[in-house]
Swiss-Prot record:
PROSITE patterns, sorted: UBC_2
Cytoplasmic side: 1-282
SUPFAM superfamilies: UBC-like
GO biological process, one term: regulation of tumor necrosis factor production
Molecular-function annotations in GO: ATP binding; ubiquitin conjugating enzyme activity; ubiquitin protein ligase binding
Gene assigned in the entry: Ube2j1
Entry protein name: Ubiquitin-conjugating enzyme E2 J1
Phenotype when the gene is knocked out: Deletion mice have reduced viability and fail to thrive early after birth. Specific components of the ER dislocation machinery are up-regulated. In addition, males are sterile due to a defect in late spermatogenesis.
Biased composition range(s): Low complexity: 249-269
Organism: Mus musculus (Mouse)
Modification after translation, per record: Phosphorylated at Ser-184 in a cytosolic stress-dependent manner by MAP kinase p38 MAPKAPK2. Phosphorylated UBE2J1 is rapidly ubiquitinated and subsequently degraded by the proteasome.
Residue list for modification Phosphoserine: 184, 266, 268
Domain of life: Eukaryota
Lineage: Eukaryota, Metazoa, Chordata, Craniata, Vertebrata
């Protein structure tokens, strides 16, 4: 198998390491890749004690993506159990249905312990979940020991080590329960954060809608009051613009654009009359006055020249 894959690939390195760590079965779980496919594993887990699955041995498949461990695997149960559908990708916080909660530090062993820890929990309508009665689950637990996988040839009777009553078994059970609790809490935190963000966004949209729904008379009175405070000189007030009829099919972005266009200041002549003269108007007035003075001075010089010429002619005739 090693010659068929690129040993420099992070996914291949990781899966080779995990295959060596999980080579020996335990009394609670076992998993190994297929001989011809490193990215498909078959696993076997024992049902958690003190539950409806006590005494059951369940078999399934784990399909890993090429981006593993950056992306989560897909988990498929092959043994009827009453908690997960057979032959369908189940929806867990460690499966491909929830890549947002997956952590690259998790491994296939983490997935096996999570499956054991999630089996006694309620499905709550998740994809691939079932809610059989306790009697049906106990019957399926007894029947699961006779299952034999055609893909890998594993028989449930001898694939796991015999169950022991000791610290090792109880430690594995506690680890599975604690892992399932932590994963469930992480998923709840992520979903609650997403819900809060969506509620804030909806509240923002509803606030914009409430501004659109204000009565026309109230909007006109508000505009008149604000303009009177800014223009105490008594200039004629501009007539408030009637808003266009609200279109319920408009998107939030279109509604915001419409509001911004309505809030732009008016540029009517009445409003411009109340504005103070600009500075460049004074500069133009000074230039015009200077031109007039120079013109008058030039005219005076011309008249003086004409007067002196006429006076010289009069003296010459005398």
């Amino acid at each position: 198998m090693e010659t068929r894959y690129n040993l420099k690939s992070p996914a291949v390195k990781r899966l080779m390491k995990e295959a060596a760590e999980l080579k020996d079965p335990t009394d609670h779980y076992h998993a190994q890749p297929l001989e011809d496919n490193l990215f498909e594993w078959h696993f076997t887990v024992r049902g958690p004690p003190d539950s409806d699955f006590d005494g059951g041995v369940y078999h399934g498949r784990i399909v890993l993506p090429p981006e593993y461990p950056m992306k989560p695997p897909s988990i498929i149960l092959l043994t009827a159990n009453g908690r997960f559908e057979v032959g369908k990708k189940i929806c867990l916080s460690i499966s491909g249905h929830h890549p947002e909660t997956w952590q690259p530090s998790w491994s296939i062993r983490t997935a096996l312990l999570a499956i054991i820890g999630f089996m006694p929990t309620k499905g709550e309508g998740a994809i691939g979940s079932l809610d059989y009665t306790p009697e049906e689950r106990r019957a399926l637990a007894k029947k699961s020991q006779d299952f034999c996988c055609e893909g890998c040839g594993s028989a449930m009777k001898d694939v796991l080590l015999p169950l022991k009553s000791g610290s090792g078994s109880s430690q594995a059970d506690q680890e599975a329960k604690e892992l399932a609790r932590q994963i469930s809490f992480k998923a709840e935190v992520n979903s609650s954060g997403k819900t809060i963000a969506e509620s804030d966004l909806n509240q923002c949209f509803s606030l914009n809608d409430s501004q659109d729904d204000l009565p026309t008379t109230f909007q006109g009175a508000t505009a008149s009051t604000s303009y009177g405070a800014q223009n105490p000189s008594g200039a004629p007030l501009p007539q408030p613009t009637q808003p266009a009829p609200k279109n319920t099919s408009m998107s939030p972005r279109q509604r915001r654009a419409q509001q911004q266009s309505q809030r732009r200041p008016s540029t009517s002549p009445d409003v411009l009359q109340g504005q103070p003269p600009r500075a460049h108007h004074t500069e133009h007035g000074g230039s015009a006055m200077l031109i007039i003075i120079l013109t008058l001075a030039l005219a005076a010089l011309i008249f003086r020249r004409i007067y002196l010429a006429n006076e010289y002619i009069f003296d010459f005739e005398l």
